[in-house]
């Protein structure tokens, strides 16, 4: 089974756009790709969710939102408030396993960060990654505060024996400040490896073909792109 779990250092760091970028590159290589959102929160009935954005950006139609709760809260809390059933970890892992049996790649995008709770028992995205034996890609912000958030996420991964697939900056500003530029070096130091990619701010607003080109330039070869961390970092040496 080829599954990749995409998490973030928090909410709003660009997980969905990064998930779409990975999916777009695999889809362009004619791989069978499925995208799974275990729980969508903060979106009401009939409104567009994260998997809809992925579909629009990539053309991938094999997308699966497994639960939806209207309140913009952690999945466990949102489920409790809505009165609806929370996501069950074992059922979720089984569904992803079934998808993976006939797909080349299954992308699993979490809600919020790695340790956000999905049910009253405290199951997290980290637990799902462990059950799936899937590597975890960490999406982080570019600027001030990113280092601590990233360090905490990486420490949580290591403590649980989970494999790190890489660290990607989800939204790089057009005019990066000093913190952003310095973080390029420090994020790599935390991860003990080059950055796996840097997506430009606004990438999620692009048309499909433009998005594919940006995805290719913004993700490392292991994720299907041409991004070279050293070359990118050299542009912003401080």
UniProtKB/Swiss-Prot annotation:
UniProt keywords, alphabetically: ATP-binding, Biotin biosynthesis, Cytoplasm, Ligase, Magnesium, Metal-binding, Nucleotide-binding
Binding site for Mg(2+): 16, 50, 109
Gene Ontology MF, one: ATP binding
Annotated InterPro entries: DTB_synth_BioD, P-loop_NTPase
Pfam families named among the record's database cross-references: AAA_26 (PF13500)
Catalytic activities: (7R,8S)-7,8-diammoniononanoate + CO2 + ATP = (4R,5S)-dethiobiotin + ADP + phosphate + 3 H(+)
GO CC annotations on file: cytosol
Pathway assigned in UniProt: Cofactor biosynthesis; biotin biosynthesis; biotin from 7,8-diaminononanoate: step 1/2
Subcellular location as annotated: Cytoplasm
Enzyme Commission (EC) number: 6.3.3.3
GO BP: any one term: biotin biosynthetic process
Catalytic-site annotation from UniProt: 37
Amino-acid positions noted as binding substrate in the UniProt annotation, renumbered to this chain: 41
Binding site for ATP: 12-17, 50, 109-112, 170-171, 200-202
Highest taxon, organism lineage: Bacteria
Cofactor(s) for this UniProt protein: Mg(2+)
EC class name: ligase
Similarity comment: Belongs to the dethiobiotin synthetase family.
Self-association and partners: Homodimer.
Its job: Catalyzes a mechanistically unusual reaction, the ATP-dependent insertion of CO2 between the N7 and N8 nitrogen atoms of 7,8-diaminopelargonic acid (DAPA, also called 7,8-diammoniononanoate) to form a ureido ring.
Name assigned to this protein: ATP-dependent dethiobiotin synthetase BioD
């Amino acid at each position: 089974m080829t599954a990749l779990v995409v998490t973030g250092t928090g909410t709003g760091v660009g997980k969905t756009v990064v998930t779409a970028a990975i999916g777009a590159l695999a889809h362009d290589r004619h791989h069978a790709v499925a995208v799974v959102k275990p729980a969508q929160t903060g979106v009401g009935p009939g409104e567009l969710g994260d998997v809809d954005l992925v579909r629009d950006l990539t053309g991938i139609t094999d997308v699966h939102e497994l639960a939806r709760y209207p309140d913009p809260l952690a999945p466990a809390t949102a489920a409790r408030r809505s009165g609806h059933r929370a996501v069950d970890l074992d059922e979720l892992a089984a569904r992803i396993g079934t998808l993976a049996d006939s797909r080349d790649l299954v992308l699993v995008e979490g809600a919020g960060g790695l340790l956000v709770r999905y049910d009253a028992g405290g199951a997290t995205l980290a637990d799902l990654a462990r059950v799936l034996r899937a590597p975890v890609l960490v999406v982080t912000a570019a600027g001030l505060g990113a280092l601590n958030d990233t360090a905490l996420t990486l420490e949580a991964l290591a403590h649980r024996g989970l494999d790190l697939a890489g660290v990607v900056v989800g939204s790089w500003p057009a005019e990066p400040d000093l913190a952003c530029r310095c973080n390029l070096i420090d994020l790599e130091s935390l991860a003990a490896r080059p950055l796996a990619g840097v997506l430009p701010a606004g990438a999620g607003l692009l048309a499909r073909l433009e998005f594919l080109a940006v995805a290719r330039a913004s993700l490392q070869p292991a994720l299907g792109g041409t991004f070279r961390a050293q070359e990118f970092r050299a542009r912003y040496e401080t």
